[in-house]
A protein has these predicted regions:
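A contiguous active-site-proximal alpha/beta segment in oxidoreductase catalytic domains
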Residues: 63-64, 72-75, 104-169
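Beta-loop-alpha module in the N-terminal Rossmann-like domain of NAD(P)-dependent dehydrogenases
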Residues: 48, 54-117
Length: 275
């Protein structure tokens, strides 16, 4: 029996749970949240649609109620308590695989501490960047000539530059085939904004990313609703435009639909891959 825990049953955690429901794995799943209302919503969402007879779900409020060993843990809380939760989890439970939601942590020192914890406890860890699982990005990846530089740009209004840049950087790194990059934050506007998530902050401006082979990524976030979502990718003779909200991409002027997968469609696939 595959043993899974989802810690944090809010908006995103409940979607992870829905995604796990699609898995064919015979599994016991523990959903952890100290807020009983969140657990109730997660349960309601899980119970929508057909029953998965391969799964048994437990809704609990404390990490101490988890079993001694888990094959996979998804930590889907907000970033502020995440390190504390990770420490509490690994102090009690032997974990094989962990998926961490971004933004990972709120302090620079937290990253080193978390890395040490994961290494000491021999845990495999991933940050959830789901675009790698979108079929059309895999199609684009097959078109890219990794021997030639990739030029990628993404611009939109109020898209959460701090919180969401990791998604664009991750898919850029996949497409470029590179393992390292340098980020230039000199284009950030030095004015703090309130994030859509209460208690967090954001910035507008430009982030420039470059790799050793000459590939570049330019991320632009502005407080101007007239600026609309657009991603462009240039590599060799290819000129690709992607518009995720409208569900299409254009390759050298040839427009075609693309399918954007939700988290509720993905986590089960990831769980099976980690098996």
């Amino acid at each position: 029996m595959y043993k899974i825990a989802v810690i944090g049953a809010g908006q995103l955690g409940s979607r992870h749970l829905q995604g796990l429901k699609l898995s064919k794995l015979k599994s016991d799943i523990w959903v952890v949240d100290n807020n009983p209302n969140s657990l109730q919503i997660a349960q309601q969402r899980y119970e929508e649609g057909e029953v998965n007879s391969n799964q048994t779900i437990y809704y609990i409020q404390l990490i101490d109620q988890l079993p001694a060993e888990l094959d996979l843990v998804v930590i889907a809380t907000s970033s502020k308590p995440r390190l504390t939760i990770l420490k509490s989890l690994l102090a009690k439970v032997k974990v094989v695989n962990i998926i961490l939601e971004k933004f990972l942590f709120t302090g620079l020192a937290d990253y080193d501490e978390a890395a040490q914890l994961l290494q000491i406890n021999h845990v495999n860890a991933w940050v959830n960047c789901p675009r790698r699982l979108f079929g059309f990005y895999a199609e684009i990846d097959s078109m890219i000539d990794k021997q030639k530089p990739l030029v990628m740009e993404y611009a939109d209004s109020n898209w959460g530059l701090c919180c969401n840049s990791i998604h664009m950087i991750d898919i850029f790194m996949m497409l470029s085939g590179e393992k390292a990059y340098i980020a230039d934050f000199s284009g950030i506007i030095p004015q703090v904004k309130d994030s859509r998530r209460n208690g967090y902050i954001e910035f507008d401006g430009i982030v420039n990313v470059s790799t050793p082979n000459g590939s570049t990524l330019r991320l632009t976030c502005v407080d101007d609703d007239t600026v609309q979502h657009q991603m462009t990718i240039i590599n060799g003779s290819y000129h690709i435009i992607i518009n995720e909200p409208e569900g299409f991409m254009s390759v050298d002027g040839n427009k075609q639909p693309v399918h954007i997968k939700y988290q509720s469609q993905l986590t089960g696939v990831v769980a099976e891959d980690r098996k």
